[in-house]
Curated annotation (Swiss-Prot):
<dbReference type="Pfam" id="PF07977">
    <property type="entry name" value="FabA"/>
</dbReference>
<dbReference type="GO" id="GO:0019171">
    <property type="term" value="F:(3R)-hydroxyacyl-[acyl-carrier-protein] dehydratase activity"/>
</dbReference>
<dbReference type="GO" id="GO:0009245">
    <property type="term" value="P:lipid A biosynthetic process"/>
</dbReference>
<keyword id="KW-0456">Lyase</keyword>
<comment type="function">
    <text>Involved in unsaturated fatty acids biosynthesis. Catalyzes the dehydration of short chain beta-hydroxyacyl-ACPs and long chain saturated and unsaturated beta-hydroxyacyl-ACPs.</text>
</comment>
<keyword id="KW-0444">Lipid biosynthesis</keyword>
<keyword id="KW-0963">Cytoplasm</keyword>
<comment type="similarity">
    <text>Belongs to the thioester dehydratase family. FabZ subfamily.</text>
</comment>
<dbReference type="GO" id="GO:0006633">
    <property type="term" value="P:fatty acid biosynthetic process"/>
</dbReference>
<keyword id="KW-0443">Lipid metabolism</keyword>
<dbReference type="InterPro" id="IPR013114">
    <property type="entry name" value="FabA_FabZ"/>
</dbReference>
<dbReference type="GO" id="GO:0016020">
    <property type="term" value="C:membrane"/>
</dbReference>
<dbReference type="GO" id="GO:0005737">
    <property type="term" value="C:cytoplasm"/>
</dbReference>
<dbReference type="InterPro" id="IPR010084">
    <property type="entry name" value="FabZ"/>
</dbReference>
<protein>
    <recommendedName>
        <fullName>3-hydroxyacyl-[acyl-carrier-protein] dehydratase FabZ</fullName>
        <ecNumber>4.2.1.59</ecNumber>
    </recommendedName>
</protein>
<keyword id="KW-0441">Lipid A biosynthesis</keyword>
<dbReference type="InterPro" id="IPR029069">
    <property type="entry name" value="HotDog_dom_sf"/>
</dbReference>
Length: 154
């Protein structure tokens, strides 16, 4: 059964500053603001620009981009939490702890990206995140973010 997205691409573009070729979330399947959790999806295709060099004979999605996909999914939830401040503030990915890569991600895979925040404050947040292909965990870790005023980045 195919899951209908609750947030499609057009709305994602309002929630994330990323654009092609660096937009690594295709849709949001579900989110819960009370539980501070989100489930999103990235469809991995052979047309991804990183497959040109990583690796042409055996294409594998770079682990760092799997982590970036997780950070973007979590960033969508922060964008929803910020709501009215979204145009003034930006969530910046600060770091990752306890990152583990458990399975290669290849063209044709569908990455399910889930994140749950243990902390969201006016300064930032922390979330546990996991990327899966089917029922297999591909990568996981603990993400941290800073919330900054966009004007401070000028």
């Amino acid at each position: 059964m195919k899951e209908a997205p609750v947030i499609k691409l057009r709305e994602l573009l309002n929630l994330l500053p990323h654009r092609y070729p660096f937009l690594l979330v295709d849709k949001v399947l579900s989110y819960d603001l009370e539980k501070r959790s989100i489930v999103a999806q990235k469809n991995v295709t052979i047309n991804e620009p990183f497959f040109v060099g990583h690796f042409p004979e055996v294409p594998i999605m770079p682990g760092v981009l799997i982590l970036e996909s997780l950070a973007q999914a979590a960033g969508v939830l922060l964008g929803l939490v910020l709501e009215n401040d979204r145009n003034k503030r930006l969530a910046l990915f600060l770091g990752i702890q306890k990152a583990k890569f458990r399975q290669a991600v290849r063209p044709g895979d569908i990455l399910t990206l889930s994140a749950e925040f243990s902390l969201i404050s006016s300064k930032g947040g922390k979330a546990s995140a996991r990327a899966c292909v089917g029922s297999q965990v591909a990568a996981e870790g603990e993400l941290s973010f800073a919330l900054v005023d966009k004007q401070s980045l000028d």
